[in-house]
Amino acid sequence: MTKIITHLLNPLAVIIPILLAVAFLTLIERKVLGYMQLRKGPNIVGPYGLLQPLADGLKLFIKEPVRPSTSSPLLFITTPMLALTMALTLWLPLPLPHPMTNLNLGMLFILAISSLTVYSILGSGWASNLKYALIGALRAVAQTISYEVSLGLILLAMIIFAGGFTLTTFNTSQETIWLLTPGWPLAAMWYISTLAETNRAPFDLTEGESELVSGFNVEYAGGPFALFFLAEYANILLMNTLSTILFMGAMHNPITPELTSINLMIKASALSMLFLWVRASYPRFRYDQLMHLVWKNFLPITLAMILWHTSLPIFTGSLPPQT
């Protein structure tokens, strides 16, 4: 009985804070964009608009989930659930400061599951049976698959630095120096690729309002739309937490080791705020520019960096112990 309770409570203890963080990330986004455009943002519901996410969530979940008569019913309903399930599953191997499941190949697991999220987007666009939704879904799939190539190669270079696929290994390897310092070109490309991977501005071509109405989720309303929304923002938080663990020495703080989780949260929040800053500052890329960036610029540079980061430690005999 105790085991059952533990297996129920442990995932809940991770899922509920993630969903709460997602809710308030939407509020921060609206506030930040508001102040950057010289306006207030939401400030009616609750003090300083703090209850706005709760009001939004309540409104979305009590709305009738309208389904177009031409859509494929089963696929149309299952894809939003699949999207959120995948987004929450990705948090399992992250050390926050202790992972839910300490996988030997944590990085590989994250890459595999993040590749599967493509199916939820493709399924939703396909099931809607609408040209705008399908074009948005195809754009999203092409974009996600393209940028996953550069993400995977950057990860490979960082694994050579750290000496293992386990995320806790990254914390140990950054006790003396952040990997951001020796690998700053990789870190810059990683951050831009995470923007593209999560379909955020300036790479939000999947939901280009001017040409695609709203992209792959154009036919979704109420609860299913809210699930897509939660999945998108959970992925943003996940990517920034992962960036923190990989490049910014997430845990190590020799003076106050008990503040490791707060340390991680502050860094991940700062990176998330940078996402919002980028959204407020840059216009949308053209589709050919988006593809040119990853295949003609990022891919050759990343391959060159992998060769450099592999050959130099072998030449100088300074490869880290492989775990």
UniProtKB/Swiss-Prot annotation:
It is a multi-pass membrane protein. The keyword Transmembrane applies. GO terms for cellular component: mitochondrial inner membrane. PROSITE patterns: COMPLEX1_ND1_1, COMPLEX1_ND1_2. Its EC number is 7.1.1.2. The keyword Membrane applies. It is found in: Mitochondrion inner membrane. It is an enzyme of class 7 (translocase). GO terms for molecular function: NADH dehydrogenase (ubiquinone) activity. Coiled coil: none annotated. It catalyses: a ubiquinone + NADH + 5 H(+)(in) = a ubiquinol + NAD(+) + 4 H(+)(out). Keywords: Electron transport, Membrane, Mitochondrion, Mitochondrion inner membrane, NAD, Respiratory chain, Translocase, Transmembrane, Transmembrane helix, Transport, Ubiquinone. The chain crosses the membrane at residues 8-28, 74-94, 105-125, 150-170, 176-196, 227-247, 258-278, 298-318. One of its GO terms (biological process) is aerobic respiration. Core subunit of the mitochondrial membrane respiratory chain NADH dehydrogenase (Complex I) that is believed to belong to the minimal assembly required for catalysis. Complex I functions in the transfer of electrons from NADH to the respiratory chain. The immediate electron acceptor for the enzyme is believed to be ubiquinone. Belongs to the complex I subunit 1 family. This is NADH-ubiquinone oxidoreductase chain 1. It comes from Latimeria chalumnae (Coelacanth).
